[in-house]
Amino acid sequence: MTPGLLTTAGAGRPRDRCARIVCTVFIETAVVATMFVALLGLSTISSKADDIDWDAIAQCESGGNWAANTGNGLYGGLQISQATWDSNGGVGSPAAASPQQQIEVADNIMKTQGPGAWPKCSSCSQGDAPLGSLTHILTFLAAETGGCSGSRDD
């Protein structure tokens, strides 16, 4: 065998092809992940409290009873603790407040705590959520995992 017949270029071709495939998959994954993060960030910014179907959350949280006071430390249709109510502009008891007053305080809670304040039921607020909004994403995820039935187990 003559020296020089096997070249490093010839031996490296399968490795180059594999490297290109791995690189392509990595880049495509990075692009998709970046788009998802950007979408989530934009949807959080553009998602307004008006996009939330508070009646659906109340139905999930308290069976739609806006005057709920079951003794579990959570009050009103949206099942808000007294401390959270007070720190977000509520006056008196959530159970004694009108649905509109509860929604106004809930809007403040949503701004500071996000949908995590209602971990199970916020994804049930399908309403007219814009495509890509946080409510839309949560609704989709809840539907996929079978959430949205019953009330929160606090």
UniProtKB/Swiss-Prot annotation:
Might be a good vaccine candidate. Disulfide bonds: none annotated. InterPro entries: Lysozyme-like_dom_sf, RPF. Disruption phenotype: Not essential, disruption of rpfC alone has no effect on growth or survival in liquid culture, nor in mouse infection models,although colony size is reduced. Alterations in gene expression are seen. All 5 genes in this family can be deleted without affecting growth in culture, however triple deletion mutants (rpfA-rpfC-rpfB or rpfA-rpfC-rpfD) are not able to resuscitate spontaneously in the presence or absence of O(2), and are attenuated in a mouse infection model. Keywords: Cell membrane, Hydrolase, Membrane, Transmembrane, Transmembrane helix, Virulence. Induction: Expressed in actively growing cells. It is found in: Cell membrane. GO terms for biological process: dormancy exit of symbiont in host; negative regulation of gene expression; positive regulation of gene expression; quorum sensing; regulation of cell population proliferation. It is a single-pass membrane protein. One of its GO terms (cellular component) is extracellular region. One of its GO terms (molecular function) is hydrolase activity. The chain crosses the membrane at residues 21-41. Its EC number is 3.-.-.-. It comes from the Bacteria. Factor that stimulates resuscitation of dormant cells. Has peptidoglycan (PG) hydrolytic activity. Active in the pM concentration range. Has little to no effect on actively-growing cells. PG fragments could either directly activate the resuscitation pathway of dormant bacteria or serve as a substrate for endogenous Rpf, resulting in low molecular weight products with resuscitation activity. Stimulates growth of stationary phase M.bovis (a slow-growing Mycobacterium), reduces the lag phase of diluted fast-growers M.smegmatis and Micrococcus luteus. Sequential gene disruption indicates RpfB and RpfE are higher than RpfD and RpfC in functional hierarchy. Belongs to the transglycosylase family. Rpf subfamily. This is Resuscitation-promoting factor RpfD. It comes from Mycobacterium tuberculosis (strain ATCC 25618 / H37Rv). The gene is rpfD.
